[in-house]
């Protein structure tokens, strides 16, 4: 209780006692299956459109005959969104033997020409490479042009001059071939640094370069071999020497015109034009940078002079990496191999990229361990990248439960609380479908859509009906429904039609009906969008075998001859319990039960007395009144639609002593008008119509 000690006006907030219950979503869907790419560990990813699905999981694929029947998920996801589904979680199943494409990038310096190798009339000794980093007088280079499969190498030539203003490098002798920039890689003998920061050389420009880092596709699959990774040198900080500090060269303290974008641990290039040194920054104080390493000699740096070629430039050495796959592109700039916050390449790439991951191979010791593209800028991920060596088994789809965030397959959907609809498109084995049913029954608030097995080749007459009945007879649950036959879609991968499991499209219809009409409306007599036909035509007489209780097989029907398209023509669960035969009744109870569970959490640990019982009863009654007014419950008035009871008659003293609050709720769900019967008889004055 508050204390009132001094005369004043006290404004206090009070609890009104009314705790409204908000209805939960029933259209969030979870799919499990093989995809072209995407994460197979961690939490299933949410996608809200097919475009977003392709960004994470890729598009349609054909991994060859070994994986026939395991490529349904991308088509199902497309069908889900075509039928106006909006929230889809995907758990990727990884085939055995799948691996990620990768490459060990090399350091040193390899670059490209940005202008054809002849910069004068006729052949000359001038070239313009894409970068001058590490290139100085004495550096040896070799130009290699690969055009139309023909490889042309220049002689190994030494650099005799470097023009920083134009980027032109002078070689010791003229080139004997016109090296075209778009086809030419420039190999150098740049290797690393000595203890004083001077550039060391390889035995030759084509000698083996030091390993730099490993670049891998973000996840398994041959898609990674199509990744395009490019690396470019860049400098975040660029400065010109202004003066030494009191002539104290030995202290390695140098004043620059500007120290913008200089930072501790940056590798800087000390560029005198024809010679270069590289040092790390120990400190940046105003315009003064302090460098690591032995004392610098007087000739290593020079203040700004009249002659441009004598100016000493200080440039930080970073790199930019781009990764491109299909229409996706990522770019990371200002990267360093040193663990500099906000710049360290491992953190910057691995924490943000959906295309690649990088691994450091050794502690950085010099800036020429920056990755250098095999063709100057481009790095090919040429190792691994397998979609798998065998088709996934039932256990791969069912998955393993290693705890939160470590589950796989169907088990991974446990980590996503809001899922209400579950499907494993195209997988019809009894083990997998039993696992789906157990999953939904154990989690209570989920419903499984089961696919029919593929049609046999040249079956005897009636075999389809026998097959689907035999499949349905394996199950008895109020938490699943099965649909027959499979649908036919346009396969954009092959420009032909193909039969497809219907669960993805039907899950989209569930979501569409939930959003537009409500979960109490049966997801039947609804158009299936995005299809061109059905694998088998089922007529009314055949449906009279499949539909009645306890068979309860939902049929997809072709009504195009009646100008009504292709429709779902069934709304039953695969159960022998007549009370739960309708899908919408089961899912309405899921909606109401979960909404009450979530909406009454506030009552836990409240004093368990009449006041609490009244408040909880009021909250539930107000919620059920809204449900009734939406048309989900029978009755012309609320008392006929539901009752809520929470008092001494629902709890014993033992219940109270053990902390139990027990409420009894009864509802009268609306059931679908599955059989519309019009009875007509003769009447002297006209006709009489009775609708039941």
Question: Which residues fall in each region the model found?
Answer:
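Structured, hydrophobic secondary-structure cores that serve as assembly/anchoring elements
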Residues: 1-107, 133-137, 142-152, 163-164, ...
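Short linear interaction motifs
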Residues: 192-213, 388-417
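Short, cationic low-complexity segments
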Residues: 237-240, 342-346, 685-692
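A short, surface-exposed interaction/processing loop segment used at functional sites
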Residues: 321, 333-334, 346-352, 455, ...
